[in-house]
């Protein structure tokens, strides 16, 4: 269960004074860089995707064992999983470590600070936070132009989705993060906003907690029209657990065979592919708004 939740929670607005190379991360920690980072260690898959998206490759000197995209990330030295190996990080001589709030324990962060290694922490709560983080990371590594281009391209795609979804009636959706205990996404999670942007109505969206525990009775009462299961090699809901939902025949989603899978890395990772995730969700919820083109 912990891995499923960690995979999801891997940004808040940031402030930066470029002249002094002093940045403030999402934990309101001031991070000083004497010069743009040239040796960067990533502590989360979403961070790794952002680093490569803004044009880094050789500069990425270490990643976690969960970092599997893009393909170049698989060849990078590994610094551990959700618990970073401090000795391995130190041996890579980074001038910047970028992580996320839920992928680094407070004691590990404190030790990195004691070693005088600059650590910048992201903690996204909205899709806009994620897009803002691309800009943030671009500034940290002196790839501002590349970051702006990536961000603008993603915003253009998001605006297209908003336009398509403007006239649809939202479908009631239940997103299954975990089954035992039963966990979903609340208003405090960026995934909640993804569901809404895609033309969905999160049936537990009034819950403030980002990843609330819910009861089966509550979900049956709210009668979702779509059941959504993240799947993937690193995380996701096993097929056997998905099929158990079919016995609840009173659910609209079951009665109309609307149990859908979505690639976990497109929804659970707050990185550049999050917009692709929204596109996939929108096509899943409202396929009629995305007619297939026919050759002729």
Q: What are these model-derived regions, one by one?
A:
Residues 24-28, 77-87, 103, 207-217:
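Short helix-initiation/N-cap motifs at beta->coil->alpha
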Residues 104-114, 226-244:
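A ligand-binding cleft/hinge motif common to bilobed small-molecule-binding domains
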Residues 6-9:
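N-terminal export leaders
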Residues 37, 84-102, 117, 215-232:
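Proline-aspartate-enriched helix->loop->beta-strand connector
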Residues 56, 74-75, 115-116, 198, ...:
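Short, structured coil segments at secondary-structure junctions
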Residues 29-32, 39, 96, 106-183, ...:
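Extracytoplasmic substrate-binding proteins
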Residues 38-104, 203:
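A short, structured surface patch at a secondary-structure boundary
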Residues 64, 188-211, 229-231, 261:
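His/Asp/Glu-enriched short active-site or ligand-binding loop at hydrolase and phosphoryl-transfer sites
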């Amino acid at each position: 269960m912990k891995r499923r939740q960690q995979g999801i929670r891997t940004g808040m607005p940031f402030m930066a004074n470029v002249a002094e190379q002093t940045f403030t991360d999402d934990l309101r920690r001031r991070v000083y860089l004497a010069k743009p980072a040239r040796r960067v260690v990533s502590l989360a898959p979403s961070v790794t995707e952002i680093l490569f998206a803004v044009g880094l490759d050789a500069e990425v000197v270490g990643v976690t064992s969960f970092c599997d995209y893009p393909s170049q990330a698989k060849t990078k030295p590994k610094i551990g999983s959700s618990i970073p190996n401090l000795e391995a990080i130190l041996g890579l001589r980074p001038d910047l470590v970028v992580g996320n709030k839920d992928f680094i324990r407070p004691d590990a962060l404190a030790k990195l600070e004691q070693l005088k290694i600059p650590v910048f922490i992201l903690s996204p709560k909205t899709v806009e936070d994620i897009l803002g983080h691309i800009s943030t990371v671009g500034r940290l590594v002196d790839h501002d132009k590349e970051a702006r281009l990536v961000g603008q391209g993603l915003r253009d795609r998001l605006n297209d989705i908003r336009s398509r979804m403007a006239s649809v009636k939202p479908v009631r959706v239940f997103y299954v993060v975990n089954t035992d205990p039963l966990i979903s996404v609340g208003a405090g999670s960026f995934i909640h906003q993804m569901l809404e942007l895609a033309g969905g109505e999160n049936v537990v969206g009034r819950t403030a907690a980002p990843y609330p525990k819910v009861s089966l009775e509550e979900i049956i009462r709210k009668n979702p029209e779509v059941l959504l299961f993240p799947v993937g090699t690193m995380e996701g809901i096993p097929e056997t657990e998905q099929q158990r939902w079919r016995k609840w025949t009173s659910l609209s989603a079951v009665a109309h065979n609307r149990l859908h899978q979505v690639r976990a890395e497109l929804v659970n990772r707050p990185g550049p592919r999050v917009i692709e995730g929204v596109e996939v969700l929108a096509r899943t919820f409202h396929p009629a708004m995305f007619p297939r083109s026919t050759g002729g």
